[in-house]
């Protein structure tokens, strides 16, 4: 006899960290987000990056054009910070409701980040303006110096960049994105109300052993890279505690299969189809389902000063198999947990 399925009804969630790419890839991946989430913070690391109001408006329209009829989805656009960015352009975009936040990529930290910031001092006028107007700063928190081990880059970023920055601009709202370490979990938990964090499903579900033991699993390779089990455990404990300044940010980052399964593969997990069920599984494993809705649907809007969504969705607890791949025009896309049986999924 099979156990009856369970249903979780939650306020419609938002994704506070998402890559949608552009062109045909954009058209393929947008529906996986727009059918589930009310809003998403869209990353600006296109080629070339989104650095002007005009570019953000055009990109937003391309996203909206890819949203299927019947989906009620609002993309929240971000500005890519560069050493040469004009603070007036940033403020104009924020005041006009085009830019929700600005994104700090240390130069060469991740995909399409070669235009990123070379030093905090180089963009201090921009950051001071953001502090003044109340615009959130979203941070990819890794140092990129060649001599620093890839597994240490987040912890080093906290001491060398994040803490000095927050000491200098004490009123600046900062989201420490896709945190992956106990160091970052402790730092955010011990911080004030102007510091928050997002966490991905892969960093809650897996550690570096899952990616490297018994063969390299390229579809678990993302940046920041998966860390040791002690770090994974710290992240799980943070979300399970009900801490209200951590929220859902999938960092869903699609790459065609041939760009992942290669001699020099790209970083990123395309988790949009399976992320919400993955988060539910983690919260269930941690006996913390009472905090699941807040993590997905309340904490983010609260930090950004936005209303929560007024519609609801349901997740059902019944085993389903994830597709092995998703068709692209001239390749395929391998989703997070491809071919695996998952416990929770969004009720269709």
Swiss-Prot record:
Modified residues (N6-carboxylysine): 103
Binding site for Zn(2+) 1: 17, 19, 103, 251
GO terms, molecular function: dihydroorotase activity; zinc ion binding
EC numbers: 3.5.2.3
Stretches that traverse the bilayer: none
CC cofactor: Zn(2+)
Signal peptide location: none
Binding site for substrate: 19-21, 45, 140, 223, 255, 267
Tagged with keyword Hydrolase: yes
Gene Ontology BP, a term: 'de novo' UMP biosynthetic process
UniProt xrefs under SUPFAM superfamilies: Metallo-dependent hydrolases (SSF51556)
Enzyme type, top EC level: hydrolase
Cofactor note: Binds 2 Zn(2+) ions per subunit.
Pfam family membership, one: Amidohydro_1
Pathway of action: Pyrimidine metabolism; UMP biosynthesis via de novo pathway; (S)-dihydroorotate from bicarbonate: step 3/3
Binding site for Zn(2+) 2: 103, 140, 178
Superkingdom of the source species: Bacteria
GO cellular component: cytosol
Reaction(s) catalysed (UniProt annotation): (S)-dihydroorotate + H2O = N-carbamoyl-L-aspartate + H(+)
Keyword Membrane part of the UniProt annotation: no
Keywords from the UniProt entry: Hydrolase, Metal-binding, Pyrimidine biosynthesis, Zinc
Described function: Catalyzes the reversible cyclization of carbamoyl aspartate to dihydroorotate.
PANTHER family, per database record: DIHYDROOROTASE
Subunit details: Homodimer.
Similarity comment text for this entry: Belongs to the metallo-dependent hydrolases superfamily. DHOase family. Class II DHOase subfamily.
The name this protein goes by in its record: Dihydroorotase
Encoding gene, per UniProt annotation: pyrC
